[in-house]
């Protein structure tokens, strides 16, 4: 892929400040074909905001997005680096669990923008109101919210 070009450089001193406040995180990277179009879909369907975008000389991108503070990345497929899209794999190996205040509304918007419903939103026995979508680029999303008045892991807000 070669060297990438940042479209936004961090302000002077930001990297040092970041190291002083470093915290372990997990950031999923969704490898897809047509990452720029996937970014536009996530913005329309999920209300995602783009934080940054790296553009490589061959036109492929890696972009970081956030949905209400939950970060994830979207990258163009790079077979030479063993980064394959769900289309190349003929399936997906990861499901993204997205908890939001109104999963019904978000799923309706996602479907209107091209997502496919795999399982409808419903109250689940494990304490979530949840459904499953496949986005137009292959990744699967479990969209839900904790059910109110329920005990168990999903009913509590994690302190992390």
Name each region found by the language model.
Residues 31-34:
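Short, surface-exposed ligand-recognition loops at beta-strand->loop->(often short) alpha-helix junctions
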């Amino acid at each position: 892929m070669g060297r990438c070009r940042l479209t936004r450089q961090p302000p002077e001193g930001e990297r040092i400040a970041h190291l002083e406040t470093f915290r372990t995180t997990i950031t999923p990277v969704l490898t897809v074909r047509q990452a720029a179009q996937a970014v536009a879909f996530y913005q329309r369907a999920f209300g995602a905001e783009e934080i940054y975008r790296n553009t490589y000389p061959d036109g492929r991108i890696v972009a970081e997005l956030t949905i209400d503070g939950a970060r994830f990345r979207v990258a163009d497929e790079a077979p030479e680096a063993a980064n394959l899209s769900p289309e190349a794999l003929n399936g997906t190996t990861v499901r993204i669990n997205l908890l939001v205040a109104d999963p019904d509304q978000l799923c309706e918007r996602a479907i209107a923008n091209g997502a496919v419903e795999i399982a409808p939103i419903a109250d689940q026995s494990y304490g979530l109101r949840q459904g499953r979508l496949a986005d137009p680029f292959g990744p699967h999303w479990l969209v839900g919210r904790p059910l109110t008045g329920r005990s168990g892991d999903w009913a509590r807000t994690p302190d992390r």
